[in-house]
Structures are given as C-alpha cells and as structure tokens.
Design a protein with these regions (language model features):
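Mid-domain alpha/beta scaffold segments of enzyme catalytic cores
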Residues: 1-225
C-alpha cells in the first residue's frame, strides 16, 4: 500500500480531471492521498475534494509564502475546518527564507500560532522548511507534544536527525530522483519506519517525468528510488 502523503489536488491541472487522477493513482498502487492546504481557501478546497472520496484526507494550514496575507480571525477558520473528520493534520506550515515572499518575522509568528493550534487539538503537523532549518527546528522544539512530518525533505542528514530526535517523520518527494541529488544517501541513514513519500503534485515531477506536471500516480518513481 502506497500513501501519497502530500499533494495539492485543488490545482486546476488535477482538480479538472480528479476522477481520472485518482484512478491512475489507484492503478499505480496508491491507495490513500492527503490533500494539503496552503491557506484557508485552499484548505476549504481540499475539504471539498474529500467529501466524495473516502480514500482522500486533507489538512489545513498556512504556507509561509502566504503568512503575510492572513487576516484577523484566520485561526478561527482553521479550528472550524479541523472539526471535519477528514481533516487529519495542520499544514502545510513552516518557514521559507529561500524566496521570502513573507517577512521572516511574520512567518515565525504565523508558524507559532499554527503550532499552538496543533498542540491544542493534538493533531500532527506538516512542516515546510527551506533555507530556514535553524529557526524552524528551534520553534518546533518549543512544542514537544506536537509531532508530524518534514515534507519534501531537501536538507542535510544532520537536519533530518534533528527532526527524528523530536519525533518527526521525514518525507521524500520527486527531488530524490534528480541527478546528483544527495538525498539517496540521506535516506539510507533514516529508519525505514520513519520514512514517508509524497509527490507534492502538481510540482516536482520525478525522473523520468521531470519538467512535466506531476500527479499522485508518479510516486512510484520516488518509491523505487
């Protein structure tokens, strides 16, 4: 059984063909999907997709790129979304200093607010970290009762070990298949029962499909790597 632990099914390239996308995933051996929200509105779209698909679950969160756009009361909306049974996690949340679409201080504020929601609801988190490992690990360590997954992991073995020590899982996506990727060496040092896989579709198509739109069925290339 393969679970695509992180995909964004509300993008038009997937949502407009959702039945066939799900069928191709099932044909490839993918039995469960997690549709991950990156802001309140997209989290609502994830929820809508799960209503007619028992094998799809969803999460609600605010991506660090979207942290600058949160409005008063957004936390209340997250709480309301998390009342639905199919909403299984808070995410995706975290820090991204690579592009800095949101000021780092705003990112940290929103990240902490959402970690507090996860702590309050006893829900796992889906973590996004890019060029922000030191700050992110520090914040995560402040919420010792919260566990989750470091999604689309692309950092060092040392960072992976820091996540593992905090009780987190490490999820690998199509970038592990890229030429000259260091990630095949990283994954060798991680206990198999702490490894997860994902597509992050419609992004990050694995080799040999790199450069094309991604979808859950292509997770088989990541698994085989």
């Amino acid at each position: 059984m393969i679970i695509d632990s992180h995909c964004h099914l509300y993008y038009d390239s997937l949502a407009n063909d959702i039945d066939n996308v799900i069928q191709r995933a099932n044909d490839a051996g993918v039995s469960r999907l997690v549709c991950v929200g990156t802001n309140v509105e997209e989290s609502k779209k994830c929820l809508s997709i799960t209503e007619n698909n028992d094998d799809i679950f969803s999460s609600s969160g605010v991506h660090p790129h979207d942290a600058k756009d949160v409005v008063d009361g957004y936390i209340d909306e997250i709480y309301e979304l998390m009342e639905y049974e199919s909403m299984i996690a808070i995410g995706e949340i975290g820090l991204d200093y690579f592009k800095n679409h949101s000021d780092p201080e705003i990112q940290k504020k929103v990240f902490k607010e959402l970690m507090e929601v996860a702590q309050d609801l006893d829900k796992p988190v889906i973590i996004h970290s890019r060029d922000a490992d030191e700050d992110l690990i520090q914040i995560v360590s402040e919420y010792s009762s919260v566990i989750g997954v470091a999604h689309c992991f692309s950092s060092t073995l040392e960072t992976a070990q820091a996540f593992l020590e905090l009780g987190y899982y490490i999820s690998f996506s199509g970038n592990i298949t890229f030429n000259n990727s260091h990630l095949p060496e990283v994954v060798k040092s991680i206990p198999l029962d702490r490894v997860m896989v994902e597509t992050d579709s419609p992004f990050l198509s694995p080799e040999p499909e790199r450069g094309k739109g991604n979808e859950p069925s292509r997770i088989v290339h990541t698994v085989s790597k």
